[in-house]
Amino acid sequence: MRRVILTTGGTGGHIFPALAVAEEIRARYPECSVLFMGGLYGPEADLAARAGLDFVGLPVRGVLGRGVRAIGAAFGMAAGIARAYAVMGRFDPDIVLGFGGYAAFAGVLAARLRGRPAAIHEQNSVPGVTNRVLSRVVPRVFLSLPDTLGAFPPQKTCLAGNPVRASIVACGAERSDPRPDHVRRLLVMGGSLGARAINDAVVSSLPALAEAGVEVWHQTGAADWERIRKAYAETGHGEGRVEAFIDDVASAYAWADLVLCRAGATSVAELAVAGKPAVLVPYPFATHDHQTHNARWLVSRGAAVLLEQKDISMTDVPALLVGLLSDRARLNRMAVSARAQGRPDAAAAVVDGLVELLKTTPRAR
């Protein structure tokens, strides 16, 4: 491969698998140019820059469920497709891979209009609208979970797993010495954009967590960082580490005994590869409730506990968290179950699939 475009955007759940594949491509093909094509309004430009990738932004926004604003979004999509089409002509990619999200719709469709080979990757247990539509025009659909095998034409699908960054794969491969029984560490993450319901539940739990000697590393999201930081200071929880965004998530996973987080597909895949027990709080307004389906994949295998957001106010969250953190045997069983579901080779499997696709797919000039 000489030139590859990876296209997606919106949330880390789409973006981080693309970055994992970029890592794998650059490790195998150091001379290959990888271009990241994403939306102008999400975190993808910053994340691509941190990963050392060239970035092209498209003026696209979500259309689904936006009412009258969908008209403006449709114009943005048309402009995004036009820009992506122009970029395809200049960059001349060998292949284009989309990871869902509206930027991927523009990028992959433009690739097909240019006659370039293209494929898509679906992270969730319930396929997104973008990938359901694009599956009609691409020859290969990479899947993360067996639950989605029936959602796409079987002759196009490849069950590859959800690509996870190499640093997290390394974290899952390490076997650290057991911590002393009195050391309990809780990692709280609300996804790349944060989660107010999770933030509030943890703040309410701080007195009980402090009494139990629980250390907390809390990713709040940028919008909630100042408020939650002040709450930690007011409660006197000296063991709290509060950040808007965790750059080195592999170190955070390695540090943690238990993770409290949303159930985005990439979070679930990372938990499995890292072998981390979790309490999962699915985002209840996700399209087609896909986060609940993602969560149940780990919960049904004994690797996680499901806490629905609507039940938080009726749940003794401090007792749940302290109880799990105090039960080393259960945490160890959950960790083993999580690791058994992990696909540390997913990025390699996707790149293998791209190489094979290039061998069999004609390219228009």
Swiss-Prot record:
Q: Report keywords, A-Z.
A: Cell cycle, Cell division, Cell inner membrane, Cell membrane, Cell shape, Cell wall biogenesis/degradation, Glycosyltransferase, Membrane, Peptidoglycan synthesis, Transferase
Keyword hit for Transferase:
yes
Domain of life, source organism: Bacteria
Q: Tell me which Pfam families the record gives.
A: Glyco_tran_28_C (PF04101), Glyco_transf_28 (PF03033)
Q: EC class of this enzyme? A: transferase
Q: Which GO terms describe its molecular function?
A: UDP-N-acetyl-D-glucosamine:N-acetylmuramoyl-L-alanyl-D-glutamyl-meso-2,6-diaminopimelyl-D-alanyl-D-alanine-diphosphoundecaprenol 4-beta-N-acetylglucosaminlytransferase activity; undecaprenyldiphospho-muramoylpentapeptide beta-N-acetylglucosaminyltransferase activity
Q: Where in the cell is it found?
A: Cell inner membrane
**GO CC annotations?**
plasma membrane
User: Which reaction(s) does the protein catalyse, per the Swiss-Prot or TrEMBL entry?
Assistant: di-trans,octa-cis-undecaprenyl diphospho-N-acetyl-alpha-D-muramoyl-L-alanyl-D-glutamyl-meso-2,6-diaminopimeloyl-D-alanyl-D-alanine + UDP-N-acetyl-alpha-D-glucosamine = di-trans,octa-cis-undecaprenyl diphospho-[N-acetyl-alpha-D-glucosaminyl-(1->4)]-N-acetyl-alpha-D-muramoyl-L-alanyl-D-glutamyl-meso-2,6-diaminopimeloyl-D-alanyl-D-alanine + UDP + H(+)
The role this protein plays is:
Cell wall formation. Catalyzes the transfer of a GlcNAc subunit on undecaprenyl-pyrophosphoryl-MurNAc-pentapeptide (lipid intermediate I) to form undecaprenyl-pyrophosphoryl-MurNAc-(pentapeptide)GlcNAc (lipid intermediate II).
Which named protein is this? Answer: UDP-N-acetylglucosamine--N-acetylmuramyl-(pentapeptide) pyrophosphoryl-undecaprenol N-acetylglucosamine transferase
Quote the gene name from the UniProt entry: murG
